[in-house]
Amino acid sequence: MSRIEKIIAREVLDSRGTPTVEVELWTEFGGYGIAKAPSGASTGENEALELRDGDKARYNGKGVLKAVANVNDKIAPALIGHDVQDQLGLDRVMIKLDGTEFKKKLGANGMLAVSLAAAHAAASELEVPLYRYIGGVQAKRLPVPMLNVINGGEHADSAIDFQEFMIMPVGAPTFKEALRWSSETFQALKSLLHDKGDITAVGDEGGFAPHFSWAYAKQDLASFKAKTPAEIALDLLVEAITKAGYKVGKDGIMIAMDCASSELYFEDKKYHFKKIEKVTGQEWAFTTEEMIAYLEKLVNNYPIISIEDGLSEKDWDGFVQLTEKIGDRVQIVGDDLFTTNPRFIKEGISKDAANSTLIKLNQIGTLSETVEAITMTQKAGWTAVVSHRSGETEDATIADLAVAFNAGQIKTGSMSRSDRIAKYNRLLQIEDQLGEDAIYDGYATFYNLKINK
């Protein structure tokens, strides 16, 4: 047993220049841990609360001094003297101290930073890597990365309503090679955009945020019958993969999408593509049935292996229909739908509303609750995708967690911005440490799809 001796929280900045919480934690026998909380732009309505100050005179109301004070004045006194290796116990102390379902009193940003700092300190004291401390000797599976190379939606000032278009190097033999393939494809995409006269500025997660004016000029803007912005993006990805010299498909690189459809869903229960409407000057909206048909069309025409939040978090029946329609050949990932909350994941499993869960630690607020969410997901035969948020820092904890949980997939941005690259570099270190024991499943990571049986 090693007791927690000191906890200090402070306000620092994330990748958007927005405040977040950093926590340092020390133990009596020299253990030390540090962690920072991430922050999302498009958030599910059932996420744990990210406590902000609301003082418009500081950071436009986005300061986190309240959350910092809660750590220093309330959480720290409650945890000093607690066994740092009792992760479940110390998380329960914070949960009880908060007393609300969605961490509305203390704030999930402060609680998560404490929870992760404690895990880092425990691993430090035992002189083992974090992935080994949490996952034990079985932690040796490197995740297939989902690299967000085209940004849209809330993550970028681009022409695309869907939020993320990602490449997945499923045919690579190792994680190291997977990153090389991805980097070369990213550079090929940049070259293509440049040649077409489009911008190569990047969004919050390091992917490009094109305007597609070159494509709009060639078709009927009023109908988009030729190509929708999503199809233009998908065509570009296929072209970039080929230009980089790789195969398109399971022996090379496949595509994943995050539609972030909760952001498109309005009171009329239709999905409104506001960016298309801005270009055309006309309403562009889908019913649930039309949205499912549109997604199925994309899957039929492009090498798409994963769709996240294809429908709104309020459209549970639609998710069931979508999973029934294409869930045997495509990973249907619930993000806003489940918010890493075991209660909602359990409901999703019972309804067959998806076949995969996105894991975002700050949606639930503690490491032990995250473990519960992943365990529940995997026991159901679903896949788990460990994920960053659009507001990140140099903290690379999720890289260790992806390996610790043998998750098989990680979603942590593109091949630019050091807040994203930090996670990939950490995974390269882990792969090197594991040596011949390192496993990279590639396409086999989609073990629950019929195409792999």
Swiss-Prot record:
Pathway: Carbohydrate degradation; glycolysis; pyruvate from D-glyceraldehyde 3-phosphate: step 4/5. GO terms for biological process: glycolytic process. Its main location: cytoplasm. Its cofactor is Mg(2+). NCBIfam families: eno. Catalyzes the reversible conversion of 2-phosphoglycerate (2-PG) into phosphoenolpyruvate (PEP). It is essential for the degradation of carbohydrates via glycolysis. Transmembrane segments: none annotated. It catalyses: (2R)-2-phosphoglycerate = phosphoenolpyruvate + H2O. Belongs to the enolase family. Mg(2+) binds at D258, E308, D335. It comes from the Bacteria. Binds a second Mg(2+) ion via substrate during catalysis. Its EC number is 4.2.1.11. PROSITE patterns: ENOLASE. It comes from Mesoplasma florum (strain ATCC 33453 / NBRC 100688 / NCTC 11704 / L1) (Acholeplasma florum). This is Enolase. The keyword Phosphoprotein does not apply. It is an enzyme of class 4 (lyase). It is found in: Cytoplasm; Secreted; Cell surface. One of its GO terms (molecular function) is magnesium ion binding. CDD domains: enolase (cd03313).
